[in-house]
Amino acid sequence: MGKNQRRDKIARLISWGHWFTFANIILCLLIGIIYIDSTPSPTTFISTVYLIVNWIGHFAFLPFVFFIILIFPFCLLIPYSKVLRSIAALISSLGIVALIFDALFFRHYGYHLNAYSLAQMAKDAEAAFTGASFVIILMIMLGFLILLGFELLLANYTWKHLSELQHRRLGAPATTVFVLCFFASHSIHVWADAELYDP
C-alpha cells in the first residue's frame, strides 16, 4: 500500500471514528436523562439552563474521551476497518455498560460508583436476588451482548454511510455546541465555587 493510500485510509477511519463517536454521544445523552430524572428539578430558569448545558457538555465529553484515548490510536496503529470497527464497538459497549450501571446506581443510592459502592451494590443484589446470582450474571451478559450487537450495527452503519454523513454538514455545528456547553458548564462551576462557596 502506497503512502498516500495509507494516509487516505487513515483519514477515512478517523472520519468514521468521529461519526461513530457522535452516535455514541447521542446514546450517552439519552442515558444521561436517568441522572437528570434522579435529582430534584431545577427551580429557576437559570438553573434549568445550567442543567441542560451541563448535561450536554458532560455527556458529549465522555464518548469523545473514549475516542481520543482508545479509538483514535487504533486508527493509526491498525488501519483495517473491520478490525477497528470491532474494537470500537467493544470499547463503546464496555463504556456504555459502565455508564448505565453508574446511572442506575446513582438513581438508587444518590452517589456514583466507586470501590465501596461496588461492594454495596453486590451485597444489595445478593440480598434482593437470594440464590439467583446466576440469573443476574446471565442477564448482565445478555444485556452486554445485545448492546455489543447494537454497537456493531452502529459501527457498520456509520462506515457504510460515511460519505452521506459527511455531506450532511452536521459535524461542525454539533461539535461547536458540545464544546461550548462543556466549557460553559465548567466555567460556571468554577465561578460558582469562587464566588458563592462559603466553607
What kind of region is each of these model predictions?
Residues G2-P199:
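Transmembrane and membrane-interface helices of multi-pass
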